[in-house]
């Protein structure tokens, strides 16, 4: 089984939403997929027509990220997960490293989301969060080079 934790997922429109949907659907060729995604208008209709097992998290944004992280942690503890995929450093930020050690983890990065001055509190949060992932996947060569300049390990 694969786990996907994302802030960006259809029916919301956008490039990241399409990427995470495509990744999730492609993973179904290799086993079941559980998606934890933020709730969105008309999500029930989308979810009922999807072959994915989608759990939506709603509520105020500040609480939603903690609720989703707790659901993800519990799911990893209770299931045999082959790999976890996170769409953003904030999606892996509140997942305990010890729990992530039960599986392989992949986190996507995008230049806009990691571009914080070296040594700033946001830069430190980004590096600490991404340090938990077994694999950090940049969306471009530019993003990879920016990440290295900002302190990511190659």
Where are the predicted features?
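Short, well-ordered alpha-helix to beta-strand connector turns
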Residues: 30-31, 81, 102, 133
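Structural motif
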Residues: 1, 82-83, 135
